[in-house]
Design a protein with these regions (language model features):
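Short, well-ordered alpha-helical scaffold segments within catalytic/effector domains
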Residues: 34-45, 158-162, 196-200
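P-loop NTPase nucleotide-binding core
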Residues: 53-55, 59-198, 211
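Arginine residue identity/basic-tract feature
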Residues: 5, 12-18, 46, 84, ...
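Sensor-1/coupling segment of RecA-like P-loop NTPase cores
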Residues: 199-213
Length: 213
């Protein structure tokens, strides 16, 4: 018996995952929850609940599934019940129990999903932020306010995020900020003599605010 009669690969699983555009209930159908994904997610859950650490880096070679794991986390914390239910179907009972014990969920998390590239990461991050405010039903009013803000620098972005996250505290369970292709963002900042410590500064700010991030 050939393997083709036992397995099939969905077209969406034959290309790289885009965390900014691939999220849907259909994305999770047929997704394999392998040991690496389980270990990465459960380590994150434990660290978050036990230490209160807010910033994490998921590393690995190209094609190892980093973006897919990030999008799975996105689904698990998403406001949309259909998306979240589809993501929960992917993980096993051990991971589900650990998720319930480690992460507060009732309103859904505001989710900023940014992918680095050839553009200024400040603009990419801010565009992703405005899209996130529109995506969550409780933060649309904040979008009306913050869409008028013109972000001028890395430090201005962090200051504005701090203000925004504090305002969103009562509206959402927390803020999930995902920066995919971080190397490309750092390369752009370096070439244009920007602030290479952007992510370090961001991590420090996240540790000071009350909103879970």
């Amino acid at each position: 018996m050939t393997l083709i009669k036992q397995y099939s690969i969905a077209t969406r699983q034959q290309r790289s995952t885009r965390i900014d555009s691939d999220l849907s209930p259909e994305f999770f159908q047929g997704l394999v929850y392998h040991g690496t994904a389980q270990s990465a997610l459960e380590t994150l859950f434990r660290q978050y609940s036990q230490t209160g650490q807010s910033a994490y880096t998921l590393t690995g070679p190209y094609g190892s599934g980093k973006s897919t794991i990030a999008l799975l986390l996105t689904g698990l914390l998403h406001e949309d019940a259909e998306v979240r239910d589809a993501a929960i179907e992917v993980i096993n009972s051990e991971s589900k129990d650990l998720l319930d014990q480690s992460v507060v969920y009732s309103k859904g998390w505001l989710q900023i999903r940014s992918v680095g590239g050839v553009n200024n990461p400040v603009n990419t991050f801010w565009d992703a932020t405005l899209e996130a405010l529109l995506e969550h039903s409780a933060t649309k009013q904040l979008h009306s306010k913050y869409s008028k803000v013109e972000i001028k620098s890395e430090s201005h972005l962090i200051e504005t995020w701090e203000s925004l996250f504090n305002e969103a505290n009562s509206l959402v369970d927390g803020v999930l900020l995902l920066a995919d292709e971080m190397g490309k963002s750092l390369e752009f900042i370096n070439k244009n003599r920007g602030e290479l410590h952007l992510f370090q500064d961001l991590a420090e700010v996240l540790g000071r605010i009350d909103t879970p991030v």
